Amino acid sequence: MSLAAKRSRAHNFSLLAVAALLAGAAMVLGSPLVPRAFAGCPDVEVVFARGTDEPPGLGKVGGAFVTALRAQTTRNVGSYAVNYPANDDFLAATDGANDASGHVQHMADHCPNTKLVLGGYSQGAAVIDIVTAAPIAALGFRDPLPADAADHVAAVALFGNPSGRAGNLMTALSPDFGGKILNLCNPGDPICSNGNSWPAHLSYVPGLTNKAAHFVAAKI
């Protein structure tokens, strides 16, 4: 075989090898560009922040809301309890906002088909207000929610929201949620209105948790 023929044969072999490598790379690298849902991702997940002095978990209002939502939909509904102190230091609400925002972003990445529902009661409502209304890091809030992650949130249900005393100002400032947000305030509740009935603040179950579940069920 002549030298020219050998060179031509080697060149053709190199081209075939490169083509095979590129094809393999396309198969390996191409598919992960589209997020894949991990096994076990629920159809819907409620991310809920409990009220002041409630023990860790969803809290009374959050638990009743999740139960009511499950009763109003045939979809698989999971839940996540926002991890934060829920104590008398209201500045710690930013801890909850960081945790809630981080979890929403995690779910958007790992369970892209799951519809997320944000919720909170009393101080927990303030936690979710921060997540939905604060587009930049400030005052201890380190993990603002990117707009693409916000798109995964189907609805927001807030109970006894402290910002209600200011006309739900935080909700009005929310750039990415608009009509997805339902703020519920019992008449006379001193936390979310100018009322003076403490029992009103403690009476969101079952009437208003059922109302919120009906609102959310229509969004998911």
Task: Walk through the language-model features, giving the residues of each.
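Active-site catalytic motif of lipid deacylating hydrolases and related acyltransferases
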Residues: G40-K115, N186-T209, A213-A218
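A generic short-segment signal for beta-strand/edge and adjacent turn/coil regions
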Residues: L15-L16, F48-G51, P85-N87, S122-V127, ...
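Serine-dependent carboxylesterase/thioesterase catalytic core
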Residues: N98-G178, L182, I191
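Intrinsically disordered, low-complexity
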Residues: P35, A39-G40, E45, D143-P144
